[in-house]
């Protein structure tokens, strides 16, 4: 399994390098990006292998590359890699599946500035984070934390100030198992020009 994970990491690094290279066609770039989007899946079980500091930085750089309303960039991130804190949060947030994750990234919005579209902006940042994890051979899953009960748990566990509101908790790690993406294409959900 470790060999497969390392192979994914190499493939992810290659993917990111290839997409930024100027010597491949626009069509090839599109194929690489779309393949990564369609390969993304929710991973809820992880090996004990840690996520490197460099990988964490890459994930956060990808998240911060997201678009935001009026370029407000309201996102704030809390990286949680303390095992005791993860275990404590796991007991109170059972859907977050933090029990095997070596780390989690909590995506939050700063409501002290332009806050009208903070959930949209932070959602875009979260999706970028998930796609970067996929490209790097890591696993991750978006778990909601914005409702009153869950946000209170996260706020207390992390000591968040009043102006910082959690959107989601994203456990990240090396997948333990063979997780497959789901084909969610459904043309019946598409309408043109009117309902």
Where are the language model's segments positioned?
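Acidic, surface-exposed loops and disordered segments
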Residues: 2-11, 17-195
């Amino acid at each position: 399994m470790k060999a497969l994970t390392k192979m994914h990491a190499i493939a992810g690094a290659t993917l990111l390098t290839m997409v930024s290279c100027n010597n491949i066609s626009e069509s090839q770039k599109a194929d690489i990006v779309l393949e990564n989007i369609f390969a993304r899946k929710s991973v809820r079980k992880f090996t004990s292998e840690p996520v490197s500091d460099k990988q964490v930085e890459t994930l956060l750089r990808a998240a911060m590359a997201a678009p935001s309303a009026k370029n407000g960039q309201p996102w704030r991130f809390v990286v949680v890699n303390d095992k005791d804190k993860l275990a404590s949060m796991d007991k109170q947030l059972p859907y977050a599946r933090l029990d095997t994750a070596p780390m989690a990234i909590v995506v939050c919005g700063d409501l002290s500035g332009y806050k009208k579209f903070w959930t949209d902006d932070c959602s875009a940042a979260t999706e970028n984070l998930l796609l970067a994890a996929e490209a790097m051979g890591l696993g991750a899953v978006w778990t909601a934390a914005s409702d009153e009960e869950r946000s209170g748990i996260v706020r207390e566990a992390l000591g968040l100030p009043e102006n910082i509101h959690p959107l989601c908790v994203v456990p990240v790690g090396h997948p333990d198992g063979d997780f497959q993406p789901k084909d969610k294409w459904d043309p019946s959900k598409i309408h043109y020009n009117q309902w």
